[in-house]
Amino acid sequence: MSTGKEKMKGKGKDGGGNEVVLCSFCGRGSDEVSSMVAGPKAFICDRCIMSSVEILRKEISAIKPTAQAVSQPFQPRLLNPKSIMESLGQYVIGQERARKSLSVAVYNHYKRIESQEWVRDDDDVVIEKSNILLIGPTGTGKTLLAQTLANLLEVPFTIVDATSLTEAGYVGDDVETILARLLQASDFNLERAEKGIIYVDEIDKIARKSANVSITRDVSGEGVQQALLKILEGAVVGVPPRGGRKHPEQQLINVNTRNILFICGGAFEGLDKIIGRRVAKASIGFGTAVKAQQLESDPEILKEVSQDDMHEYGLIPEFIGRLPVISTLDPLDSKALRNILVEPKNALIKQYQKLFEMEECELVFEDKALDSVVEIAIDRGTGARALRSVLEGIMIDIMFELPSMSGVRKCVITEAVIAGEGEPEFYYEDGKKKKTA
């Protein structure tokens, strides 16, 4: 009986007196195959080599479509303006004018990017980037609009608070930090990041204190506006790969901001007074001061905003010029807040109902209870943001107790619960009702 070592070496000699060796994989002898490749301690025949090649070819062909898909240029999901506006309406209640303005601006922006691939080098018409400025009271949906747009178009998105930004060399975040966050949101895929959306919140907070030029440094106001100019318009900016400050020996990622859409938003408190005074001055006759006061209290006055008004508020002309699309949002009345509670796809009431559903319990809000939530939110004066804080305060105790309660199948929130004068109604498997947690 031959050993494994003897098998590997061979099994004797062939008719011509040559030593016969065996394939280490299939066991065929060299006299049965066309050729045999020798390794340090093994042999492989031509048949096994061909079989291996065929197996590898099949595996590579299965992987190849994915590899091709990865190598294809990234293209945002482009929808027409009507589709964008309708999709925004599923998440943002009201604000038709702002939704329409945003839909057109975003469509034109990404259509412009798409056209860059086939536009001729000698074409005299170059479509410039149109960044967007959203003006409206707090809690009216500015951030939600930007976030929903990014989700809809399937592009990277990041939110930056303008109040955290300072000029280079001062304590705080450089403007390059904005791009670092967008890179992180795109998993450091540079091509995706360069077609993303950046929402700069509280942009009104970087307005300088007056329209007059000051000799003192304003490191978080006009200085930040100046620093933002180049990335708003389009420039190649060196960004630290993991955020933070630059240092001389650090390797930077060059990000081209030419195709990044910037959406800036702010409440701009006091802007209505500036607009009211300007519009009143344009009128002829007595009572200009009285008319100015009337205009200031008009909720529609923000629609009359002009670039001169923005300059008087404290934004420098160069900065205003890089935000050519200005859209205003309306204050939310009680009807709008009521609809926000229940109508959007991700409405607050639906979110709480989903949480209760996980506990196999149905959550029901009576109509009067919802009306009470809206009244409290209006008194707080922070728009839709107040709705969540009101509901959290009411629901926290209920959600604390519910997982420990067995057999509960339904929970009803009444007006008395919202007012803090009653307990929710719990219905059990046997149909019995109990008004306590």
UniProtKB/Swiss-Prot annotation:
Function of the molecule: ATP-dependent specificity component of the Clp protease. It directs the protease to specific substrates. Can perform chaperone functions in the absence of ClpP.
GO biological process: cell division; proteolysis involved in protein catabolic process
Family, similarity comment: Belongs to the ClpX chaperone family.
Underlying gene: clpX
UniProt-annotated binding residues for ATP: 137-144
HAMAP family recorded: ClpX
GO molecular function terms attached to this record: ATP binding; ATP hydrolysis activity; ATP-dependent protein folding chaperone; protein dimerization activity; unfolded protein binding; zinc ion binding
Positions that bind Zn(2+): 23, 26, 45, 48
Disulfide bond positions: none
Matches recorded under NCBIfam families: clpX, PRK05342.1
Domain ClpX-type ZB: 11-64
Keywords of this entry: ATP-binding, Chaperone, Metal-binding, Nucleotide-binding, Zinc
This protein's name: ATP-dependent Clp protease ATP-binding subunit ClpX
Cross-referenced Gene3D superfamilies: 1.10.8.60, ClpX chaperone, C4-type zinc finger domain, P-loop containing nucleotide triphosphate hydrolases
Organism: Chlorobium phaeobacteroides (strain BS1)
Quaternary structure, from the entry: Component of the ClpX-ClpP complex. Forms a hexameric ring that, in the presence of ATP, binds to fourteen ClpP subunits assembled into a disk-like structure with a central cavity, resembling the structure of eukaryotic proteasomes.
One Pfam family this sequence matches: zf-C4_ClpX
